[in-house]
Amino acid sequence: MCAFAAILSLLSVLLMATSRSSDAAPLGTLVSVEGVRDNQLVGYGLVVGLNGSGDGQQIRYTGQSIANVLKQFGVTLPEGIRLRSRNVAAVMVSANFPAGYVPGQKIDVTVSSMGDAKSLRGGTLLLTPLRAADGVVYALAQGNLVVPGVSAQGRSGSSVTINATAAGRIPQGATIEQEIPSDLDAKPSVRLSLKRPSFQTATSIVAAIDRMAGPGAATSRDGTSVEVRAPEDPTARVAFLAKLTAINVTPQKEPPRVVFNSRTGTVVISQGMTVSPAAVSHGTLKVTISEGAIVSQPNPLGGGKTAVVPLSQVDVQQDGNRMFNWPAGVSLQKIVDTINSTGASPDDVMAILQALDEAGALNGELVVI
């Protein structure tokens, strides 16, 4: 009997350890290392080779840009000549410079039309310098565009467009020319910034790092960052960070949350969202105000004057409302399903969710985006 009880105790410990480990996540997914981040690049360029779908005559800076490009190749246009070409489009080129990239490596670029170009399909981006916020050129972009959209137009002017045709990408279209310096090895310690600030998660991170690197290796002043002592040698520091970001940490469990997109009407409900006992009555009130005018015609012998008198009509219509009554602990998903079954609009759903939140019956967080 004692042996059986010991086996049950061991199984319970194993199950608890398994459930805890399943909630754990690598530290690298919970934090970002200060000094290791991406940088944004942007540039202005021209896309050529378009089959009549480029910028029109109203976009004057496109013609000026063409003249500047020709001037670099020794071609000078007479004064007062305005270039007109529907095969060229002025574009903005943007790219993401990953941390640690060195000269010679390639990155993807996004090309977006600035003018009234109808489509960039089939175009080629001319050599375009890409600058960071400090104005320094860090990469050069050039290549053929990949445009996912399709546009077609008939002689009568009717057109059909599928997806976006005024923007495209060039995979591996930019070459790094200058490295962005990093301050990763400038300090004796490394700061880890939590992607989701939490005192509990910061405490768990400090405890996990101390178990790996020894007591006092990590400190935290608040719930947003953790300071970790790191080797001064660059090679040893990289190896230390690789080992550090691989350790498993159990983060704080996120509170139940319901997210409502007011533009699209999308409602996303996280697991565990419940409500307290509540009763909701919601009706649809429609108010219609119309403005018009009537002609006031006096009697023929009355001596009056014909006049136009404004007329306002206000119509109020209220549909039949229903009373919803939910017991304690019911899931919010069931509530939304019940509301939707009555034919309620997304605005009605949002109004009910906001009312539940204001009444304190929503056991979670309501986020409106």
Curated annotation (Swiss-Prot):
Residues 1-24 form the signal peptide. It comes from the Bacteria. InterPro entries: Flag_FlgI (IPR001782). It is found in: Periplasm; Bacterial flagellum basal body. It holds the Pfam family FlgI. GO terms for cellular component: bacterial-type flagellum basal body, distal rod, P ring; outer membrane-bounded periplasmic space. Keywords: Bacterial flagellum, Periplasm, Signal. One of its GO terms (biological process) is bacterial-type flagellum-dependent cell motility. GO terms for molecular function: structural molecule activity. Its main location: periplasm. The basal body constitutes a major portion of the flagellar organelle and consists of four rings (L,P,S, and M) mounted on a central rod. Belongs to the FlgI family. Assembles around the rod to form the L-ring and probably protects the motor/basal body from shearing forces during rotation. This is Flagellar P-ring protein 2. It comes from Burkholderia thailandensis (strain ATCC 700388 / DSM 13276 / CCUG 48851 / CIP 106301 / E264). The gene is flgI2.
